[in-house]
UniProtKB/Swiss-Prot annotation:
Part of the 50S ribosomal subunit. Contacts protein L29, and trigger factor when it is bound to the ribosome. NCBIfam families: PRK05738.1-3, PRK05738.1-5, PRK05738.2-4. One of its GO terms (molecular function) is rRNA binding. The gene is rplW. One of the early assembly proteins it binds 23S rRNA. One of the proteins that surrounds the polypeptide exit tunnel on the outside of the ribosome. Forms the main docking site for trigger factor binding to the ribosome. This is Large ribosomal subunit protein uL23. InterPro entries: Nucleotide-bd_a/b_plait_sf, Ribosomal_uL23-like, Ribosomal_uL23/eL15/eS24_sf. The keyword Translocase does not apply.
Length: 98
């Protein structure tokens, strides 16, 4: 499957945290994705961009925090993460090039 331009709109960037690193040991990868992205779209985009087979996709929406800026309350943007589990034998190394 070849990657289309809309696939790059779905996947924003890889998430590199302690929890994401533990997920990679269980053959998984974590990506920040577009808020309107669905699980089938995320699966299709990962398979097309990285040439791997996806076993499952789980998503999490993190609500933006309320913070004060110059004494006035503001709200940070909501974020969506996708925990992508890969089939056995497939790997994605997101730490390359850091």
């Amino acid at each position: 499957m070849t990657a289309k331009p809309e696939h790059y709109d779905v996947i924003r960037k890889p998430v590199i945290t302690e929890k994401a690193t533990m997920t990679s040991e269980a053959n998984g990868v974590v990506f920040a994705v577009a808020m309107e992205a669905t699980k089938p779209q995320i699966k299709e985009a990962v398979e097309a961009i990285f040439n791997v087979k996806v076993k499952a996709v789980n998503t999490v929406v993190t609500k933006g925090k309320t913070k004060k800026f110059k004494g006035r309350p503001g709200v940070r943007s909501d974020r969506k993460k996708a925990y992508v589990t890969l089939e056995e034998g497939n790997t994605i190394d997101v730490s390359t090039g850091l």
